[in-house]
């Protein structure tokens, strides 16, 4: 008779259970595997069976019980320090927990046990890459490939780091090797497409993305990358579709929502873009780029306080996000918070001293604040960083002209022709004759083209006479209808045309120029400014206005203009709020006021304060010839910075101009209350430090009383 030892059967059952648990793990039945090993007598807090502990840890990791998994693997290693599989599993866990330093040391311990383990080298490379150690990661992946050339994942990972390093041709080779090993791996086709796009091979990139989508039509990464390529190529509608498909497939794909917003902004759909950016933030609240782009959309929608908040949130998420600091400065500037804007631009520069845009923007704000030397330094720094920076060149030009430094200022002012946002940029393609570059005009036909405002033409019209004096045989002036009757009476102007006719006939001329280019080519300095045109009003119009105004009954007549063109970029600052702001003038006796307002401000003029002698002449003004005839009958014009000042001063009428507290036009220069452009006729009233319009108008009223030789009276 054969007997059986009592302990033999349980040992066989335990071994079978461990093997069964291992098989369950391999089959993905982790809960069953864990339940089985936990039922074993050897499995307790002091368990010493390394294989059992490894199975328990592996199943716990798969079930998301990460703390248990770490505990069991560390116990396994304590029990059997040379158990390589435990180090491998623990490394994967630590990498998942983003405990990269611990993961690195774990993988390095594994490699002391299995130095030729290609998978371990690959995983080590992944950890090193996550720690920002790209060179070490590359070395690890190359070692994995050397040990196992068919390791497709290692080739792909190598492609990632090579792309990051800008070694695009090497990256392409790595991805092509990965795809040769795994031709149906959609993600690898997408990554190859990203490299090809970076190489500028857009057709090849599109083919790679489409191959990825043929393998997996719901590949959100491929859809997102394809959308980016289509956006870059200008296929905005197709790009929108690709991004919308990406977020449909993966609604929480924050980057695709961000990219959809960007293409919607390119389509001028800022409200829709806002929705996309907010969707990105709903899925990733700390997404700095989404906060930043939301700020751009809100800024475009003129919701400035909200845009400011978005930029500040972007900075809170990513303090060194330079564009957010720069754009915050822009939105603060738009809210007239100039000192805060300057601080924001300085913070952008502190993070990136080579950001030309921030230096240029700082220059603009400092110029508006009146800090001209500092503004000049900022503009010059922007140009040192980017010599072809048109905005900075033009900003410096304006500053130099305002400072009376005409030699360099006029030369830089020509940069307006390189500014795509300026009307001047389009003139060159519109006219079919050469632009005048300063060569002799003797015997030539010159087309003078109005590109700038009405006031500019009245101020610089003096150069029509100068051009004729250089020997030009024929001067044709293309201008707006409101100017044509006035300039038709200017000596030396042979033809006054509308813009359409002038453009159609431009090939008949030897060259074209703008009046504001003439000072550069004729080398005008503050001491050699030509005298203004003396516009001579038509006698018939003067008599018509004399009849309209009637007898003055011994009172002096003063023309008033308190508002300019509402489309002017600085109108909000240079125009008075309303006629009521001029109330201090009503205290000066012996004056009859005449409103020269046309358009904006006419309603105020038609409904003056009770008892105030104000004649509203706007209804009868058809063009500048009418305004000139009316000004001829006045003794003084008091105005803000508008074309009326140029007209009155050109006619020799005394003109007092009230200037705004910020963004004063360069032509009025700095530090003087007169103008070399209109000597003896123009008087400038600058705001004193912190002075608002009401106080400035009080000073004008005092000057008016002194001019009249009377005492101002108190209003009831």
Q: What label would you give each PLM region?
A:
Residues 1-716:
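Alpha-helical solenoid repeat scaffolds of the TPR/TPR-like class and their adjacent stem/linker regions
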């Amino acid at each position: 008779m054969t007997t059986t030892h009592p302990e033999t059967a349980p040992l066989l059952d335990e071994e079978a259970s461990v093997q069964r648990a291992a098989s369950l793990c391999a089959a993905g039945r982790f809960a069953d595997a864990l339940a089985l090993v936990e039922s074993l007598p050897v499995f307790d807090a002091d368990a010493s069976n390394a294989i059992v502990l490894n199975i328990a840890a592996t199943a716990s990791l798969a079930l998301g019980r990460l703390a248990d998994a770490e505990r069991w693997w560390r116990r396994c290693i304590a029990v059997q320090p040379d158990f390589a599989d435990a180090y491998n599993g623990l490394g994967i866990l630590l990498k998942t927990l983003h405990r990269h330093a611990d993961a690195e040391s774990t993988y390095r311990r594994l490699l002391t046990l299995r130095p030729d383990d290609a998978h371990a080298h690959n995983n080590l490379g992944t950890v090193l890459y996550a720690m920002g150690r790209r060179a070490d990661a590359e070395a690890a992946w190359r070692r994995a490939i050397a040990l196992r050339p068919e390791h497709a994942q290692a080739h792909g990972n190598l492609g990632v780091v090579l792309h990051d390093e800008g070694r695009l041709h090497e990256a392409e080779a790595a991805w092509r090797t990965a795809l040769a090993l795994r031709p149906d791996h959609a993600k690898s086709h997408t990554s190859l497409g990203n490299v090809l796009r970076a190489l500028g091979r857009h057709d090849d990139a599109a083919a790679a993305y489409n191959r990825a989508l043929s393998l997996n039509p719901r590949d959100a990464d491929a859809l997102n990358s394809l959308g980016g390529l289509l956006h870059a190529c200008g296929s905005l509608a197709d790009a929108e579709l690709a991004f919308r498909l990406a977020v449909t497939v993966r609604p929480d794909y924050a980057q695709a929502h961000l990219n959809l917003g960007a293409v919607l902004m390119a389509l001028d759909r800022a409200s829709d873009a806002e929705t996309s950016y907010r969707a990105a933030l709903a899925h990733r609240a700390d997404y700095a780029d989404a906060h930043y782009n939301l700020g751009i959309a809100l800024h475009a929608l003129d919701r400035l306080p909200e845009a400011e908040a978005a930029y500040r949130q972007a900075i809170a998420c990513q303090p060194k996000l330079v564009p957010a600091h720069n754009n915050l400065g822009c939105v603060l500037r738009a809210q007239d918070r100039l000192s805060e804007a300057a601080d924001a631009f300085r913070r952008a520069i502190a993070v990136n001293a080579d950001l030309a845009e921030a230096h240029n923007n700082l220059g603009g704000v400092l110029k508006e604040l009146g800090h001209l030397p500092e503004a000049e330094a900022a503009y010059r720094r922007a140009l040192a960083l980017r010599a072809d920076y048109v905005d900075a060149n033009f900003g410096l030009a304006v500053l130099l002209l305002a400072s009376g430094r005409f030699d360099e200022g006029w030369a830089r002012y020509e940069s307006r022709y390189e500014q795509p946002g300026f009307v001047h940029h389009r003139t060159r393609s519109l006219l079919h004759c050469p632009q005048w570059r300063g060569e002799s005009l003797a015997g030539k036909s010159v087309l003078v083209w109005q590109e700038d405002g009405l006031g500019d033409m009245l101020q610089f019209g003096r150069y029509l006479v100068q051009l004729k004096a250089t020997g030009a045989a024929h001067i044709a002036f293309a201008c707006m209808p409101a100017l044509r009757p006035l300039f038709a009476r200017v000596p030396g102007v042979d033809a006054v045309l509308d813009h359409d006719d002038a453009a159609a006939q431009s090939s008949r001329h030897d060259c074209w120029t703008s009046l504001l280019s003439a000072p550069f080519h004729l080398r005008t300095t503050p001491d050699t400014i030509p005298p203004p045109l003396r516009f001579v009003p038509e006698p018939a119009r003067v008599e018509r206005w004399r009849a309209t105004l009637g007898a003055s009954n011994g009172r002096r007549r003063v023309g008033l203009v308190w508002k300019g063109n509402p489309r002017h970029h600085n109108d909000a600052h240079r125009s008075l709020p309303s006629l009521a702001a001029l109330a201090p003038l009503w205290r000066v006796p012996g004056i009859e006021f005449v409103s020269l307002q046309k358009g904006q401000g006419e309603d105020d003029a038609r409904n003056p304060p009770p008892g105030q002698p104000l004649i509203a002449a706007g209804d009868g003004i058809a063009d500048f010839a009418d305004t000139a005839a009316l000004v001829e009958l006045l003794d003084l014009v008091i105005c803000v910075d508008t074309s009326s000042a140029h007209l009155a001063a050109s006619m020799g009428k005394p003109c007092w101009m009230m200037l705004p507290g910020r963004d004063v036009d360069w032509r009025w220069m700095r530090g003087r209350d007169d103008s070399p452009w209109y000597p003896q006729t123009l008087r400038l009233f600058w705001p004193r430090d912190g002075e608002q319009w009401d106080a400035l108008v009080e000073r004008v009223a005092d000057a008016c009383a002194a001019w009249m030789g009377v005492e101002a009276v108190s209003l009831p």
